[in-house]
């Protein structure tokens, strides 16, 4: 594997290449087809990892104009069969199904890969897709650990003909864009501090018992780049992997990534200079390893400060919202909840502006309630592929925002504040423990 400094050098080269989404002004090239995808061409999509979010993405992409979901991949045949049936019921066409991601990426039957696998797979799958000549939609977080962010940027810089974006879909939601314009345009004066949060009331995952691997699951493929475990436990999958160090990244990257990304966007900052975290697994005594209660704070030099509060087991709202971001300025506050709306409050807390939209969540859509909003983000990716227009969420921005939250998790696990180079994102004079968490061990043969 390359050294971290080599990652950073490659990331700097990637910045210019990725800032506009594509270097091809008349449409991006996909080596899958070997031709330019033009403004009116069909884009063939393959989706990998379809148990939950991937099923929602596949269903939503299948409804897009000039798009066909042609390939589906999952190493659990139950998830694969369910998704294949869903797309067939929507479109009348049954996509090709793959259990093995290697064979999926080799297929010439799709141009663009949508990656919605568990977190430990994100960077590996994105790199495989780029190397196979696929455009990439990478669900958040962009990676499992900071070193993988640099590796993704290194690989993306080698393929300027391909368009890679990330699932930070709120960067395309109209009223979120308008709210950031308010913040950065001076509507509340200079902003020096912003906070973000996520609340839920998740149950215990209990103490797992060793059981046989389900016959429908290829457990080796599911583990992929992660070091192997000796036993399969009944509380590992499909969602609980989020809470284990080996595969997941905790609530901070499961949901915090979305809102720290908005925070960073509004403040106009990149890497911090200092990161601290407090918290722990407080609510239940079970196998859940990441915190269920966490407060991460960021110092961005003399420019600004920010924070993220995560409460996985106490859903009491903050400022009326279960999730959100608040920007505090000299003359008031811009407040965003989880949907496509925002408020401006004066210094006494009175609402002086409330922007809403008919584009909102659809409770009746049980597969993807935010589908209409998410499809705006998908359209932006497709436009970048077809015409080279700018991405709303570049992979560079996604990697930086992901890394901010990863740095908070490192501080949490080492139990100490960490200093960060604000230009490169590297740790400054790190402890051996912090350095070890900047990267990870890989299963032999599965390295990036």
Question: What is the role of each PLM region?
Answer:
Residues 1-138, 147-163:
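N-terminal glycine-/serine-/threonine-rich beta1-alpha1-beta2 phosphate-ribose binding loop
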Residues 31, 177-178, 190, 195, ...:
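Contiguous beta-strand/loop segments that form the cofactor/metal-binding neighborhood of enzyme cores
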Residues 44-48, 69-73, 114-116, 137-138, ...:
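Structural recognition of the beta-strand scaffold that forms the well-ordered cores
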Residues 50, 172, 371-375:
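Generic alpha-helical segment signature
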Residues 76-79, 98, 118-122, 142-145, ...:
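Short, solvent-exposed turn/loop segments enriched in Gly/Ser/Thr/Pro and often Arg
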Residues 135, 143-221:
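A contiguous active-site-proximal alpha/beta segment in oxidoreductase catalytic domains
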Residues 140, 186, 388:
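Conserved G/P- and acidic residue-centered "switch" motifs that form tight phosphate/ATP-binding loops
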């Amino acid at each position: 594997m390359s050294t971290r400094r080599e990652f950073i050098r490659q990331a700097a080269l990637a910045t210019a290449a990725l800032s506009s989404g594509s270097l091809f002004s008349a449409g991006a090239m996909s080596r899958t087809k070997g031709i330019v995808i033009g403004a009116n061409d069909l884009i063939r999509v393959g989706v990998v990892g379809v148990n939950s979010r991937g099923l929602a993405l596949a269903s939503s992409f299948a409804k897009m104009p000039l798009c066909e979901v042609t390939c589906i991949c999952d190493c659990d045949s139950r998830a694969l069969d369910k998704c294949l049936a869903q797309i067939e019921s929507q479109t009348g066409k049954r996509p090709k199904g793959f259990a093995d991601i290697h064979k999926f990426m080799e297929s010439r039957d799709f141009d663009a890969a949508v990656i919605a696998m568990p977190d430990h797979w994100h960077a590996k799958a994105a790199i495989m897709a780029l190397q196979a000549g696929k455009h990439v939609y990478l669900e958040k977080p962009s990676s499992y650990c900071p070193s993988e962010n640099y590796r993704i940027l290194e690989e993306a810089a080698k393929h300027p003909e391909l368009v890679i974006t990330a699932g930070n879909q709120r960067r395309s939601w109209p009223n979120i864009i308008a709210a950031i314009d308010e913040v950065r345009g001076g509507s509340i004066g200079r902003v020096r501090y912003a906070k973000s949060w996520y609340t839920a009331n998740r149950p215990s995952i209990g103490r797992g018992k060793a059981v046989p691997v389900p016959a429908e699951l290829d457990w080796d493929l599911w583990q992929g780049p992660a070091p192997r475990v000796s036993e399969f436990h009944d509380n590992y999958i499909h969602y609980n992997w989020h809470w284990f160090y080996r595969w997941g990244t905790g609530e901070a990257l499961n949901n915090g990534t979305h809102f720290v990304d908005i925070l960073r966007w509004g403040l106009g900052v990149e890497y911090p200079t200092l990161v601290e975290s407090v918290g722990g697994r407080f609510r239940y005594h079970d196998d859940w390893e990441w915190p269920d209660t966490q407060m991460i704070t960021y110092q961005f030099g003399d420019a600004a400060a920010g924070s993220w509060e995560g409460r996985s087991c106490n859903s009491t709202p903050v400022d009326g919202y279960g999730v959100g971001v608040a920007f505090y300025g000299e003359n008031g506050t811009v407040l965003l909840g989880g949907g496509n709306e925002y408020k401006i409050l004066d210094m006494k807390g009175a609402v002086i502006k409330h922007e809403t939209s008919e584009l909102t969540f659809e409770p009746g859509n049980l597969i993807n309630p935010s589908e209409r909003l998410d499809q705006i983000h998908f359209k932006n990716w497709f436009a970048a592929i077809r015409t080279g227009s700018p991405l709303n969420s570049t992979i560079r921005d996604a990697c930086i925002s992901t890394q901010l939250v990863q740095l908070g998790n490192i501080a949490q696990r080492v139990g100490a504040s960490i200093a960060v180079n604000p230009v490169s994102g590297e740790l400054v004079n790190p402890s051996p423990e912090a350095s070890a968490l900047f990267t990870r061990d890989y299963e032999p043969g599965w390295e990036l």
